[in-house]
Amino acid sequence: MPSEEKSLVESYEKLKELSWLIGEWTNTEGNEFSKETWTRKNDSTFSGFSYTQVENDTVFAEELLLSQKAEEVYLTVVAYGQNSDTPITFTRVSTEENAATFENKLHDFPQRIVYTQPTSDSIHAWVEGDVN
């Protein structure tokens, strides 16, 4: 009787569900300009960078990493000048078509980060939670 072999090839389908994030996204409101860029680093990881400028002065910048480990998808954020530049990891708690929510209930603020893609040429991102 032939023995069954376990496939060593991992599937990253849960991360692939977020492929709509990949690209360059910009927003201008008055004198404020924001840009977020996502690229596919490999099968299990997307990397991102986001910044906001007001009158050409960078007032916010962060590195982002989306990764799938086993069946979980994690969003790790390093917001420069916050949390001593320590990476903070959020776990995906829900995914709908073109929407994802990540949560870390132990973080002071935010506890949730939400991404949506309302149309093919835009994404929306916001944070939620209590200020501890």
Language-model features, listed with the residues they occupy:
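Short, conserved beta-turn/loop elements at beta-strand boundaries and strand-helix junctions
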Residues: 43, 120-121
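Central antiparallel beta-sheet cores of small beta-barrel/beta-sandwich binding domains
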Residues: 27-28, 33-106
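Bacterial Sec-dependent N-terminal signal peptides
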Residues: 1-9
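Short, exposed beta-strand-loop hairpins at the edges of beta-sheets
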Residues: 114-118, 124-132
